[in-house]
Amino acid sequence: MTTRLDRLVVLLDSGSTSVVRETAAKQIGDIQKVHPDELYNLLGRVVPYLKSKNWDTRVAAAKAIGGIVENVPVWNPNRTSPVKKEETEDLPSFNGDTEEKPFIKTEEGAPASSQSQVVVSSNLTSNSEVSKLEEERLSTRSHSQEIKPIVDFGPDEETAKELNTELKGKFENSLLSFESFDIANVLKAGKKLLGSASRDYDVNPANYSTHYLQQLSNLKSRLDLAGEYLDDSIMNDLGDNVGSNSKGSPTTSIPEHKTSINNNKPEDTPTPSENVHLSARQRNALKRKARQMKNSQKVRVIDVAPTLVHQQNSTSSADKKTGADYNFTAQSRSDRLVVEHKAPIVPSAAVAVTSDSVWPFETLVELLLIDMFDPSWEIRHGACMGLREIIRYAGFGYGRVVGKSEAENEQLNKKYFDDLLCRIACVFALDRFGDYLADQVVAPIRESVSQVLGVALIYVPNDSVFSMYKVLHSLVFQNELGLTNTVWEAAHGGMLGIKYLVAVKYPLFFSHSDYLDSLINTVIHGLANHDDDVRAVSALTLLPIADKLVQEKLSSCKNLLKVLWDCLDDVKDDLSSSTSCVMDLLSSLCSFTEVMNLMQETANSDPEFSFETLVPRLFHLMRYTLTGVRRSVVYALTKFISVQTSCSWITGLTLRLCFQNVLLEQQEDISKSSCELAQRVMDILYRDGPESFSKLLYSHIEPMLKVSITPIGSFRRPYPLDTTLIVKPSGQPYAPSTSRERNNNISELSNSRTKHRAKDDPKGSFCFSVDEPMLNGDVEFVGEERMLKARLRASSLLGRIIGRWKRDEILLFFKPFLQACLTSSFSTPVVLGSRLIESFFEVEDNDLTIQKDELYHLLCDQFATVPRENYANLVSQLHVVRAQCNALLNTFLDVGRLSRSKIPSLAVVVKGDPEAGPIAFGIADAEKLVGPTYENLCKLLSPSQKAQSSKALNEIKYLIIDEISIYKIAKERQDIQCSASIASAMVTYDKLPKKLNSIIKGIMESIKKEQFSCLQMHSASAMMKLISACYKESRQVISEKIVRNLCAYVCMDTTETPIFHDSGKNGILSLHSIGTSDDNDEQVSGKLVDDSDDVSNDRKSSLSSVSDKDAAVLQRMGAQLTLQQMAQNFGSSLFSRVPVLSQCLFVPLQQYAESGFPSEVDQASCTVGQDLLDAMSILRFLVAYLDSGLQSEIVSTLPHLLATLQSNYSAVRNMASKCFAAITESNAAGSKALHLLVEDVVPLLGDASSTIHRQGAIECIYHVVQRLGVRILPYILYLIIPLLGRMSDADQDVRVLATTSFATLVKLVPLEAGLPDPPDLPQYLLDSREKERKFLEQMLNPSKVEAFSIPVPISADLRKYQQEGVNWLAFLNKYELHGILCDDMGLGKTLQTICIVASDHYNRQKLFEESGSPKFAHVPSLIVCPSTLAGHWQQELSTYAPFLKVSAYVGPPAERAKIRSKMKKSDVVVTSYDICRNDVDELVKIDWNYCVLDEGHVIKNARAKLTKAVKSLRSYHRLILSGTPIQNNVLELWSLFDFLMPGFLGTEKTFQERFVRPIAASRDAKSSSKERERGTLALEAIHKQVLPFMLRRLKEDVLADLPPKIIQDYYCDMSDLQRKLLNDFVSQLNINEELEDDETEKTQGTRKKKSQKAHIFQALQYMRKLCNHPALILTEKHPKRNAIVKQLAKENSGLHDLKHAPKLTALGQLLRDCGLGNSSVNSNGIDSALTNAVSEHRVLIFCQLKDMLDMVEKDLLQATMPDVTYMRLDGSVEPTKRQEAVTKFNNDPSIDVLLLTTHVGGLGLNLTGADTVIFVEHDWNPMRDLQAMDRAHRIGQKKVVNVYRLITRGCLEEKIMGLQRFKMNVASTVVNQQNAGLSSIGTDQILDLFNTTADEQQTVQNIDKEESEDAAGRGLSGTSKKALEGLPEMWDESQYDEFNLDGFISTLPKDAS
């Protein structure tokens, strides 16, 4: 059974997001708070995930451990039992036991005895009693989840205790201490810790203790501590223990924890103690097997308990007397009780418990300390994080023991922590693993172990802190250790340790000035280190204490500041990552006034230390290669400005450099920060007024203006920036690098780590390659929008500069420039100039009115000139068009052979060229050429010329047409950008012209068609300003028209807003666009065609092509942005300021809710339906931006939306669902909408009377779930149960969305319990949620499900397993689920079915009487079975439930017609499959309660007419009975579940892809390992998915009193005649094949294939008959029959002689062995047949063929055994009389033999009168044979059943047996013992299995992807391919956020003790 804990633990690894993982980790910790006794159970489950290969999994596991440990009370042995110092001498040193046995409490508080189960109380629970819940958990825990001991001491407790104490003492003596620790020796001789491990480190999980001690021993060599720091005798003893298997040697057992459902366990491998007498070969074999077991298990539960106690296996005498060997099952009648034997209970393993004497985490910490030195970096990383969490919360108890005084425990605590600190130092010294992907190296292990150090320092005394500091200091100053070659990784680790040490213990340094001075010197030394990463960490070390340093040690800052400035001045490496860290420290220090004063004092004596000298050193880093450095420079300069009152270092050059930063920067955040920095610089420069400002910038403004308006070209023709207009920090113009220099820079970039770099060019001339793409105008590399965005920001900055310029010079200097921009032949200067003017307008200064008016008129003048005829930046495209036109004319000349005089000439110059005149080539010329000119020239061609040249001419013509289209689209884009930019600038001035049409059109065109989001958003903002201005000036008519058009544009995108008249009424529209999200707008391709101004009503025609649809998306996005900006800016006054918007949104909804649709709504002229869709669509996009003050308007709309959800139109339901989901996500009315969802929408799911209502409700829930994600958690309980019922809905669309929604919610169920209640949830909903939670718990935990009490008297006594079967059927009934009861043959499936059907009919009748609801009205149930069993069902129903009205719908058509009128009044109708197929039209008219398919595997063929007929039946509950649900392949299972729950296993195609194909491929002998793996995984997956819906019990498991069934194969050798016939047939077959090969070469492939199939089938049939009897094939048609008969006659023999049929001979012998046919005369002369009227054995003889039965009857029984009495049951017996024959055979013991065909007698019949079954023939389908043999082996059988299978050796039958074995394997894998009952079936699995259903499409895609990858990898060699497969994925840099020092410090506990 999978518990909530299991699912939470799995989420640590499988959680889709970090939020889900963290929530799961938190809730695991909360479990520890509620159940403190679960400590080791929780830790044992979580700890294995620390070794995961996945980073996020390890982090989540560490957080879970932290949550667990945090909720464990602080372990303080002296708090509860203080011990005086003088008393400690007599106490043991390890566990402190004062008695011989651990302190044990029984349940009643009495002393524990061997007769009772014990539960041990730990010190964690103080004096509280262990709860009964814990006792139940320990006693009922399943075998796979038992917690096993970490150390098993064997039977001798005293020896165990001594060894435990001895080991503890040795461990204590082996602890490292600072007094003897030599870090230099570790550095010199220690083994390096690299990134990965080899196979040599594989650990056998069954022998973990050996690995544990071996790893402990390995530390001696790894750390090179031989003889110096560990006692040799101790290590030798440990080594001896590792290698020996002595009695006292501790062993470790790690139980297997499987996340899959399968409980089948591999055979136990012998423990080391059992291996003593094994040979070397046997031991190696066991090792290999153990390694395979290790590789096969994903997660193992590790027991981390320090001690254990064994559970006693013996039971009390009371238990023995009360019938421990029996099951008691109460019956529906209170006076009945069934008593059954039960199998003996296997005693559970030892239960681990805690000891009062040991810190609870001791064992786990020891394991993690060993893992900290594991060769694999992932394991080291996980171990460090685990240690960090344990020490963080529980470090106080580390090393302490009970029985020691407080002082002694303090010493032990110090001793253990000193050992930990020494080990941490060793990791710093030896770790070499680092990630070089980011700007600076990140060393996960060194960072993580630094955090362990940080938490450990909380608990250690000061002397240990200083000792650790000295060790870390030595790692930094390695030259002091005498090392010739320093190790930068060790120095890096040392500095990391110091960084965390300082962060945690900084007060200690400030109280010891000598250590503080040493710290500063260490940092300065680190800053001078040649390694860049050491410098970076050194700078970060002082960053957290910069304020304290300034306050306490200001004098020491002087040297530090000098070093920091020197570091910045000395940057020569273009990849120096430490620069940003140095910059951060410097800016932090300089943010203090004291430091600035200190620098000023220093500057007075040393001018080189002034800011005017120092700050310019930063300027050359503004365009540094590394992003982090550029970001830090901007941040530092901003900090400097904010703290300085006088910034003398700020000049005009400073502003220009900031401007250039904006112009060239590609990173969005740095660009924005640069704008802010430039604004601050501008403000400082403007302090002395406009005149001073202008003077400072006079020499800079012109180049800034010129460079900012550089046109943006295309990838065909870029326009580079004029580098002479860009200056370096020195003030010199930027000199572009030569090609040689660029190549050098590129080669340097390729070296990610360069420790020693030669001197570069002098400062100021160094050329960084980061800006080359921007400088070169490389649009293809940078992207046109990114480049434009930078230019626009620069232009806005220039506008603000002009706004501060000297007033009388603004127009004089800047108007000509701006006029040139607006009249430029390029489009870019127009856009940028307009933006500059707009920015100028935004400067608030009344003195600028005249200048603004002048520039406004300039805009008005230029606005009239747009659009222009052409743009210079499109000249290159026009040249391309001209070249293509010229090629077309040349084709007419060369290919068409026209004379040159007839061909027109083209102008050489194109429009836009500098020398172009009025007759220059333009796009109109090109259009004319491919139009009338082309037609005229074609007419001049002769027919032969046309034939020769038409193809070439058409190709070039269409090329020209394409180029024209490209040019026109580009031209239109430039027109829109220019007109929108000018119009937006005009609107900003707040002075609207009288005529607004052109302005509105310019901005609206940009909103509709602009592809660049920055321009579209700007136009949206301008339109918002325009609307606001119109309302201010009382021009509402204009603004209302604009708003209505915007609303119409929002709805133009038919992918988001459907067309009302195109949508039908049935179905769910979301299923047609389930992959469409609301956030896919970025994928718009941008091919624009539509340029109409008006909103077209005919959307379908205007949006027909792909490009038109993309244009509609752009329209929708632009209009959406505008409305959203309006909502954000207008706030709560939105609807009062823009009342027309309120009308568009709410009026259509209100009208529909009040009166519905008018009758003419379906007419094309009626727009009511479309208006409603549009209103909901707009509200959907707008609601998230509405102010919370508008909540009342939105809440009042919710009831209207509820009405639309129940609309008859699918489009209305679709939009209502999306709109409702959007409201649930909004702040305005989200909680109210969710309340409505629970109260009103969810009940619609259960409306059986209306499919429309269910479709609307499920569509709404689907969209809410998809939108809210994790935020749906508080409401998940209201949804999960209703969705579960709808997953088997009669409507396919409802099923699909219910399953999809369920699959999304099911992953969140484990997280629900730990969440607080929403603050605004009404009390009645809270109460309802508690009921739902209780309901869900019953479903998830089968132990909490109440046993189903059968409310009707059943005339039979149910066995225990039958009652459990009825419970399972009741469970399905309760949750509206359906299933397969596939118990073994003979276990009473019929009886269990009758019980649930009768009970449900009774319950429905009772509910109908109480409520009168039509939902519970009487409806009959239908039993469909094979015709043979129809009578059997009638008999069983009349026997067990005589109160049910049963109608048998069987017989000829006339009789059936009479019964039809009675069927609806009957309780149960029994019919056959044949009748169901023929009369399906009558049966589908009735709604059935239960539809039961007996032997339901007959519908295995999904395409059969019978199957389709059965699946068309309608019923509330569906049940299949089948002892063999899978007979040949798993595809049959799909057909069965397609009847039960259509869609549950996906479509047949996806099922084939996911399951059938991989399983079939894995059978192939040539299959690869990956294919075999896929096959295995597919079998496991299908098993997991169908598990909860299939109940399977085997007779041997549930019937202890059922005698055994013995199956024996009886081999027969072929007779001479058979062998001769076989050889002749094979020879003839080979000859025929040769002849056919020659003939079929002339025939078609399909005919050949069909003939071959028929040929093979005939051959198989021939050989099958030959195995049975030669007479079966030697018919009258056989060509050799006469010759063989004559030959036999000569030998006095015949075809029917038994010697020719060895099977009949063997059958006769078997019958005689059974005592049949042995007629003889005894001594009294009396025939023995008369003496023994009844034989001891009775026999069933099965054959496949009726002809074979005839031969058995005539040739054997009648001819040679006349005294054997027999009956016969085959197809010749009428179905209605077959049950009568069965009854007669069972009741008359004088009948010796029953002859049957497998087809007729092998299904459903009870033939327990026989005890011997003989198969003369065998079925290809093994399940048919199994069913046949179980006719005798079933309930009621008192004798051992012997089954004999007659097999002809060396022939086809042996192959049939082999095929049967494979099919049995597949069937047993899918349906196995996990389907045994509610407890093992795991009803909770319902919440897991639908993940597969929801993701099936993705799975198919993954399979295809894997196959394509396999195909791609086939070209690689074996080694290369393995290496490629072994490469892990790159991890995300955001994972390193956990190494943030500030975040770490914030998590440290406030109180360490």
Curated annotation (Swiss-Prot):
Record PTM Phosphoserine, positions in chain: 144
Example GO BP: transcription initiation at RNA polymerase II promoter
UniProt-listed CDD domains: DEXHc_Mot1 (cd17999), SF2_C_SNF (cd18793)
EC number: 3.6.4.-
Residues that hold ATP according to the record: 1383-1390
InterPro entries: ARM-like (IPR011989), ARM-type_fold (IPR016024), Helicase_ATP-bd (IPR014001), Helicase_C-like (IPR001650), Mot1 (IPR044972), Mot1_ATP-bd (IPR044078), Mot1_central_dom (IPR022707), P-loop_NTPase (IPR027417)
HEAT repeat segments: 36-74, 358-396, 513-551, 554-592, 608-646, 1191-1229, 1270-1311, 1580-1623
Segments forming domain Helicase ATP-binding: 1370-1543
Listed Pfam families: DUF3535, Helicase_C, SNF2-rel_dom
GO molecular function, one term: ATP hydrolysis activity
Disulfide bonds: none
UniProt key word Transcription: yes
GO cellular-component term (any): nucleus
Residue spans of biased composition, Low complexity class: 113-130
Main location: nucleus
Assigned protein family: Belongs to the SNF2/RAD54 helicase family.
Quaternary state and interactors: Forms a complex with TBP which binds TATA DNA.
Protein name (record): TATA-binding protein-associated factor mot1
Source species of the chain: Schizosaccharomyces pombe (strain 972 / ATCC 24843)
Lineage of producing organism: Eukaryota, Fungi, Dikarya, Ascomycota, Taphrinomycotina
Chain's gene name: mot1
